[in-house]
């Protein structure tokens, strides 16, 4: 696979290019100006206007945390915010960003960097599973949709929000994964023999590989990182709209996710619901991890962490 090199280190970007991104920041933040108290944990839950993300965000707020709500649907986000405000134990603020756009993903990170001085937990939960398994969709950046939304967006956020995670250390990153299929680095975007479910599982494997790859580097910064298969085919809109029959509850997935947020579970692990699980062999392959990190940097112009360091 030939990848166009588009590395632009954030410290060397032209002023005009950086200014263009900064000027878009205001479009991502909602109107609320709610700030966390010093006693509250600050937790970003991507994809938190529905499904697992929504249930997790509400549970965290009930525990007294300040939750950064992310999604695309403003109306659904306001409903989540309203529930949190009516409960009164936690607080929240909403940011809108479409992860099918690297510009919007980076704009979200820039907005959060501008509005917060710390981040205790980053939960990379947002995901997509297309109902049409034969229609290959490409983002505005030219990348296969599942790979960008499910994996690259979380990679970008993890890299760009490292200063806030370090400011809150010990802090945590949790990648919400699923079943896995090995990546084909010669056809990373599935241009040949496309299958939507295959694309979904490969993107989830990339999340787990990222978890293992970043573990050593992030540990030096007192940041833990773990991946989770929350539960199989939960009763979420994404699963139902993709045409699958739900086989488990979103509450089970929520509780499994909360375990990684709240409990001392270590770092660099893949959890199958509540227990440590076994990922596919490629996920533990150091050379494959390093290759994924190199490719991710090339595709996004963001360096998140050194693989295996």
Residue spans of the language-model regions?
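Conserved hydrophobic beta-strands of the Rossmann-like cofactor-binding core
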Residues: 42-45, 122-123, 173
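Conserved glycine-rich cofactor-binding loop
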Residues: 49-50
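N-terminal Rossmann-fold NAD(P) dinucleotide-binding loop
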Residues: 53-54
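Conserved glycine-rich Rossmann-like NAD(P)H-binding loop of the short-chain dehydrogenase/reductase
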Residues: 63-79
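Rossmann-fold cofactor-recognition segment
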Residues: 87-103
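Catalytic loop of short-chain dehydrogenase/reductase
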Residues: 127-147, 166-221, 229-242
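C-terminal helical subdomain
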Residues: 244-282, 286-290, 294, 298
């Amino acid at each position: 696979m030939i990848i166009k090199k588009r590395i632009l280190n954030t410290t060397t970007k032209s002023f005009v290019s950086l200014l263009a991104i900064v000027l878009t920041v205001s479009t991502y933040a909602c109107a609320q100006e709610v700030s966390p108290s010093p006693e509250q944990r600050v937790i970003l839950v991507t994809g938190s206007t529905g499904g697992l993300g929504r249930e997790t965000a509400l549970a965290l707020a009930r525990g007294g945390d300040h939750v950064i709500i992310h999604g695309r649907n403003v109306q659904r986000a306001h409903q989540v915010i309203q529930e949190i405000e009516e409960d009164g134990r936690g607080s929240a603020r909403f940011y809108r960003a479409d992860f099918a756009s690297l510009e919007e993903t980076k704009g979200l990170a820039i907005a959060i960097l501008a509005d917060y001085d710390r981040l205790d937990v980053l939960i990379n939960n947002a995901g997509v599973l297309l109902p049409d398994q034969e229609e290959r969709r490409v983002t505005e950046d030219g990348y296969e949709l599942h790979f960008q939304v499910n994996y690259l967006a979380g990679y970008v956020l993890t890299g760009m929000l490292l200063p806030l995670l370090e400011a809150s250390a010990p802090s945590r990153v949790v990648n919400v994964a699923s079943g896995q299929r090995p990546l084909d680095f010669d056809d990373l975007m599935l241009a040949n023999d496309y299958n939507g479910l295959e694309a979904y599982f490969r993107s989830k494997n990339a999340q787990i590989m990222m978890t293992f790859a970043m573990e050593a580097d992030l540990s030096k910064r007192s940041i833990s990182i773990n991946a989770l298969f929350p539960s199989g085919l939960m009763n979420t809109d994404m699963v139902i709209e993709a045409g699958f029959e739900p086989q488990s509850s979103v509450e089970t997935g929520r509780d499994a996710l909360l375990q990684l947020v709240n409990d001392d579970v270590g770092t660099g692990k893949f959890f199958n619901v509540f227990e440590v699980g076994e990922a596919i062999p490629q996920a533990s392959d150091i050379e494959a991890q390093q290759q994924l990190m190199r490719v991710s940097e090339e595709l996004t112009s963001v360096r998140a962490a050194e693989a295996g360091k």
